[in-house]
């Protein structure tokens, strides 16, 4: 069908010129929220690894205001436009083009299985010891770099790359906390 294997990232991807639709049956999972937009960014921060205690880069997928989402409650029929931007967590089912793009940027943010969640999602790995760094500590735990309740101006999250191309995935959408956190990221999204 045209998929390619990246042995370093240990992931299958579909090159840009190949139609991704035939591959969805192999990458589709559960009933998470589906998100889509015409652009997205790769955000980066640093944390200390829980295992080796060395500083390591961590990554997250950010999408600006106006992204569309639908949930299992929508019966998969109604897309709602968001008035806020978001950093996604527990991301699964990214488009193959997006997976290939992420694999070309970093080998430490990749699809891997979580014993806690019971399925694979795009998770971070320590750059020194390869320990899995789960999304709870990064997105849901107070003090995590992608946790939205930072005081204005205190986040160290950088927008590394912005892509003006179709984006779609399944994952958890975060709202609330300090809207200025999202506003700052959105400004970085458009200036990257």
Describe every region a protein language model picked out.
Residues 32-40, 108-117:
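Short, intrinsically disordered, charge-biased short linear motifs at domain edges
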Residues 42-45, 119-122, 147-148:
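Short metal-coordination and nucleic-acid-contact micro-motifs, chiefly zinc-binding Cys/His arrays
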Residues 58-59, 132-136:
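Short, non-ligating residues that shape and space the ligands of small metal-coordination modules
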Residues 141-192:
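Polybasic, proline/glycine-rich intrinsically disordered low-complexity segments
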């Amino acid at each position: 069908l045209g998929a390619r294997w990246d042995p370093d990232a240990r992931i299958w991807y579909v090159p840009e010129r190949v139609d991704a639709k035939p591959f969805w049956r192999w990458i589709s999972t559960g009933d998470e929220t589906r998100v889509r937009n015409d652009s997205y960014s790769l955000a980066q921060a640093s944390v200390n690894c829980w295992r080796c205690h060395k500083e390591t880069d961590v990554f997250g997928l950010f999408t600006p205001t106006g992204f569309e989402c639908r949930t299992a409650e929508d019966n998969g029929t109604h897309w709602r436009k968001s008035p806020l931007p978001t950093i996604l967590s527990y991301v699964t089912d990214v488009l193959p083009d997006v997976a290939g793009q992420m694999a070309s940027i970093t080998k430490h943010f990749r699809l891997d299985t979580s014993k806690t969640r019971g399925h694979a999602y795009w998770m971070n790995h320590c750059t020194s010891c390869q320990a899995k760094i789960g999304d709870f500590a990064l997105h849901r735990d107070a003090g995590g770099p992608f946790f939205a309740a930072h005081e204005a101006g205190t986040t160290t999250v950088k927008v590394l790359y912005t892509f003006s191309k179709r984006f779609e995935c399944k994952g958890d959408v975060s709202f609330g906390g300090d809207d200025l956190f999202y506003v700052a990221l959105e400004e970085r999204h458009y200036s990257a």
